A protein has these predicted regions:
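Inter-heme linker and motif-flanking segments adjacent to c-type heme-binding CXXCH motifs
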Residues: 48-54, 81-84, 109-125, 137, ...
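Gly/Gly-Pro-rich "capping" loops immediately C-terminal to redox-active cysteine motifs
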Residues: 31, 35, 48-78, 89-94, ...
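Intrinsic, low-complexity N-terminal interaction/targeting segments
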Residues: 39-42, 102, 118-119, 168, ...
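C-terminal capping alpha-helices of c-type cytochrome domains
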Residues: 93-115, 188-217
Length: 220
């Protein structure tokens, strides 16, 4: 193969890669299809109060009524290894991009729609200062139910122990099986002590929220 042919081959290959990536990004989720694919999900997220045990004991997150774009981004991060968690990586790697889009669409509309007041419960001053320090409301919204971007998560009413382990995971960079490598959140979480992260998690978890853990049966 001569130089011209090699360059042409490389160019065409790059076009195919870009096209495939664009198609994956542009997938439309089908909630009805997602309902048929959620058997693995309900084994943990369909049991109210279900607890994970790695890297410590905590309740698995509520995902019903969560933003579809956030669920999609989270699953892709587990699949790529950006988020390090053995169980979730195994689950995510078994899913195609279409599966991820469908499941995300399903859980966004799953559960009962709840109307939450725009104004949040005023935090204690020490917590307010911590939230201001990180600019948390700037991305996650003033009431922590209406993020500025749909790829950001709703936080209000999420399990406190999950929020705490999630925040800690952004500080954990040296562990091969635990941690999250998101540059923005890692930078935000780094300046806080663990005690301060706990205060933030406890406050956010105490807020009225739209997120739900809805009991689901594997038997349909």
């Amino acid at each position: 193969m001569n130089q011209i042919s090699l360059k042409l081959f490389a160019f065409l290959s790059s076009l195919i890669f870009i096209s495939a990536a664009a198609q994956a990004e542009g997938l439309t989720g089908d909630a009805a299809a997602g309902q048929k694919k959620n058997a693995t999900c309900i084994g943990c997220h369909g049991i109210v109060g279900y607890q994970a045990s790695f890297p410590e004991v905590y309740k698995v997150p509520k995902i019903s009524q969560q933003n579809a774009k956030y669920i999609e981004a989270a699953l892709k991060a587990y699949k790529s290894g950006e988020r390090r968690h053995p169980t979730m990586r195994s689950v995510a790697k078994s899913l195609s991009d279409q599966d991820i889009a469908d499941l995300s669409a399903y859980y966004e509309q799953h559960g009962n729609k709840v109307t939450v007041a725009e104004q949040t419960v005023e935090p204690p001053k020490v917590v307010a200062d911590l939230l201001t320090k990180g600019g948390c409301a700037g991305c996650h919204g003033a009431n922590f139910n209406k993020p500025m971007d749909p790829s950001y998560p709703k936080l209000a009413g999420q399990h406190r122990d999950y929020l705490y382990i999630a925040l800690k995971s952004y500080q954990e960079q040296g562990h091969s099986t635990w941690g999250r490598a998101n540059a923005i959140m890692s930078g935000m979480a780094k300046p806080y002590t663990r005690a301060e992260l706990k205060k933030i998690a406890d406050y956010l978890g105490s807020l009225p929220g739209e997120l739900q853990a809805v009991p689901q049966s594997k038997f349909r």
